[in-house]
């Protein structure tokens, strides 16, 4: 039964990290509704790592698209590669905002912004923002022709995903659509942009709960990691195909229902 809990956490993380509904909110709320423990920082860090590995594996040709070259040329290639530079630029805002919160308002963040009421209200706000994105005119910006200001703008919106209930994929895909991206590439760039952001979040969780790793044990964490990895791959593959010809409507409706359910159970 204990291992089923880790499988559940892995499924929730893997699916909701990429489906625009907020993984943090679902991990917290579903744990509360089912009467099971909050996954905690150590488990959260491990299962987030599963999502990062899934992104790296799924997009391995985009990230490591090189033929046999010397190490020096490969490093030069990485440094000058447009996509990787865009991801780096888009990650800057969330690093600055996340660091500021950790330094200046850590208690307010944990006690107020992570409350169920806050998550419900944020879910409604995100539903409205996603509606604006879904209603916007289809654009022509894509992975190949975007510029660094495009990636930085999306990165600014990604920074708000620090707040529970926002959904990193939801806010980045929506902001990309509003700023003129094609649907399929908006989702693809969102997932790629998530690699450093999710990795940094996992590192912060790991550092803050290092001792807890030893109490949980290796095998339960491994179960959570593998479950997250597999469910993340399924979510990425499904959503890239889905967004190539569909909008955000179904997720907008879900976010409204999710917010209402939380409010009714306060």
Swiss-Prot record:
GO terms for molecular function: undecaprenyl-diphosphatase activity. Its EC number is 3.6.1.27. The keyword Cell membrane applies. One of its GO terms (cellular component) is plasma membrane. One of its GO terms (biological process) is cell wall organization. It catalyses: di-trans,octa-cis-undecaprenyl diphosphate + H2O = di-trans,octa-cis-undecaprenyl phosphate + phosphate + H(+). The keyword Cell wall biogenesis/degradation applies. Its main location: membrane. It comes from the Bacteria. InterPro entries: UppP. Keywords: Antibiotic resistance, Cell inner membrane, Cell membrane, Cell shape, Cell wall biogenesis/degradation, Hydrolase, Membrane, Peptidoglycan synthesis, Transmembrane, Transmembrane helix. It is found in: Cell inner membrane. It is a multi-pass membrane protein. It is an enzyme of class 3 (hydrolase). The chain crosses the membrane at residues 39-59, 86-106, 112-132, 147-167, 189-209, 216-236, 246-266. Belongs to the UppP family. Catalyzes the dephosphorylation of undecaprenyl diphosphate (UPP). Confers resistance to bacitracin. PANTHER family: UNDECAPRENYL-DIPHOSPHATASE (PTHR30622:SF4). Bacitracin is thought to be involved in the inhibition of peptidoglycan synthesis by sequestering undecaprenyl diphosphate, thereby reducing the pool of lipid carrier available. This is Undecaprenyl-diphosphatase. It comes from Prochlorococcus marinus (strain MIT 9301).
């Amino acid at each position: 039964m204990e291992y089923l809990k880790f499988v559940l956490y892995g499924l929730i993380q893997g699916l909701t990290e990429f489906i625009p509904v907020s993984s943090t909110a679902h991990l917290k709320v579903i744990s509360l509704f089912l009467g099971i423990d909050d996954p905690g920082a150590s488990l959260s860090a491990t299962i987030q790592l599963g999502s990062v590995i899934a992104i790296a594996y799924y997009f391995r040709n985009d990230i490591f698209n090189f033929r046999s070259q010397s190490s020096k040329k490969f490093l030069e290639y990485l440094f000058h590669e447009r996509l990787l530079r865009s991801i780096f630029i888009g990650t800057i805002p969330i690093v600055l905002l996340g660091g500021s919160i950790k330094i200046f308002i850590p208690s307010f963040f944990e006690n107020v912004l992570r409350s169920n009421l806050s998550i419900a209200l944020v879910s409604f706000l995100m539903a409205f923002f996603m509606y604006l994105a879904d209603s916007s005119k289809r654009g022509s910006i894509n992975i190949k022709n975007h510029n660094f200001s495009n990636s930085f703008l999306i990165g600014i919106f990604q920074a708000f995903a620090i707040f529970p209930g926002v959904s990193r994929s939801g806010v980045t895909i929506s902001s990309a659509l509003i700023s003129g991206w094609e649907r399929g590439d908006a989702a693809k760039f969102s997932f790629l942009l998530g690699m450093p952001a999710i990795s940094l979040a996992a590192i912060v969780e790991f550092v803050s709960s290092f001792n807890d790793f030893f109490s949980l044990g290796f095998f339960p964490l491994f179960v959570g990691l593998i479950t997250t990895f597999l469910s993340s791959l399924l979510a990425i593959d499904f959503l890239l195909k889905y967004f190539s010809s569909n909008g955000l409507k179904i997720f907008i409706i879900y976010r409204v229902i999710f917010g209402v359910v939380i409010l009714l159970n306060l």
